[in-house]
Amino acid sequence: MPSLSALAVLATPLYRAYFATLRLRGLLADGTTLAPAQYAYGPEIFALCECDAVALAGLIAHTRLTALVALGRDGDWASGILARLGFGLVRGSSLRGGAGALAHLIRAMRASDAPGAIVVDGPLGPPGEAKPGIVLCAQRTGRPIRALGVAARPKIVFRRTWSQIFFPLPFSRVVIACEEPLTVPATTDREGIATLALELTGRLATARQRAQAALGAMRTKGRIDGVVPAYASPSTSAETCAGTQPTSGTLQAPTLGDRR
């Protein structure tokens, strides 16, 4: 049986070809839309939920990212592919190797101006809930945090995974919404870090809602129009990854086992 590293080598060109088919569109906090290649990438930390991870991996075509990847078999598989796609990787999670991984990630970010990326609700959830590690990382590096939210159509949603991670089908429309930067003062105490993590959770939900609204506008008008700026109050309750309901263009994959 081929090793994970061998499978990663074989899968990498397929992932590159797949990502090239996605019709990605970025949505800024003020409602401006642009292609991901037009975004001014800099020393910031992208916060994302695990459900959005596959779609967001396509950003590597436009910039080099430093990402935190969980330990374990699934993490080994993902890191093998991501490394070959050009990601800088640090391994660990809140359950395994967390403190050491955070220290390595901070050093990597201090040594580079490239953006970082952290899945904030892994490795086991709750879905959409930001943990404090990313806030600590922002505090110690002086980098702002940008919450990202994704909507895609058509897609496959793996309903039996804890995060309900989704896979945009080839040639899908994908909208990536980002929020205003969240800054973390160097003097922030433990209570303040917890408060900012809660605020980040809300921003992630808002970003996803804005991405969904923009994608719906694209479907009805053939373009992004009437989208919700990040500073506006959402008209409906924010959704987490697991709380998002199936919409037209969404296929369910109910037989996939939980791959925690």
Protein language model features and the residues they cover:
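Short, hinge-like loop/turn segments at secondary-structure boundaries
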Residues: 83-86, 108-109, 163-168
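Alpha-helix C-terminal capping segments
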Residues: 59-62, 84-85, 111-112, 139-144
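Catalytic-site beta-strand/loop segments enriched in glycine and acidic/polar residues
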Residues: 105-141
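Catalytic core of membrane glycerolipid acyltransferases/transacylases, capturing the structured
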Residues: 43-97, 158
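A cross-family acyltransferase "interaction/gating" segment
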Residues: 131-189
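Membrane-anchoring hydrophobic helices of lipid-metabolizing enzymes
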Residues: 1-55, 59-62, 169, 201-246, ...
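Generic beta-sheet signal
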Residues: 92, 119, 147-150
